[in-house]
Amino acid sequence: VHLQIICFNKNIDLSSPEELFSFAIKDKNVFLGVELCLAENTAEGLMNVQLTRGTMSSENFTQVIKMGVKNGITVECRLIDLLSCIRSPQYIAMPVISIKQPLGDFAESHEEKSAEQQEPLLEIKKTALIRKGTVLESYLSHADASGCLWLTGKAEQYYDMIEYNGSPMDVRIASDSHSLKLDNENGRLVCRLKLTVLAHSSLDIRDEKSSDQVAALVKQRLEENITGVWNKALYENRTDIFDVWRLFRHKYPQSYLKYADRLDEVLGSVELETDITCRVS
């Protein structure tokens, strides 16, 4: 049986992962794909939540994280992701798990809640930013996490609700193609995202005008989420969770070495250009 999840307190120091996870580096039987997360309050309190069917299990945690990533509300962080930062810049996003307590008792006029309804639930309200081993005070919202997944090409499909003709409309957005490149334009570093998505709405949209309207709304939502997380992570917190530094090192290795001690400053000046195409079906 493999170790499936490691949960930390928010005050954890992750600046020396080789020491913190020495047991994993030495033990070939430890699965490097183990999920990492932070507890909203304390890891001990989270792991000791009592259920009528027993104590909270690792399967509960991994399922919550996997579904969170699939639904575009958080960013996955595995042990191998952290270990890869041992000799590289450490910019990480990590799910924060909290306990959602059941609502208060019903009034006498209501039926009593079932045992399952009274169970505490695990939920992901936000995603932490970790920079050089420190968990920052700024967190990613669900929209930010979605933008990060689209920007890095890790989003497969995503369900969202957009306002269409004055009414809410459910939309399923699936990735069709993705590319992220870094260019030097007259001394300006520009990160170019080219993204094509397929959108399927809950309404039967057949005419071209309506299709174009929905496509424009989906494109606007994606641009807002992507630009929002770029500004929050890279500009406001100097935390490159998009691996732009890898693009910089690969394409401009000499400049990377030259500015290695000023990498945060360089990355904080990179501009983002988005080219998003949406096709509605």
Predicted regions and their residues:
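A glycine-rich, acidic short-motif signal
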Residues: 1-281
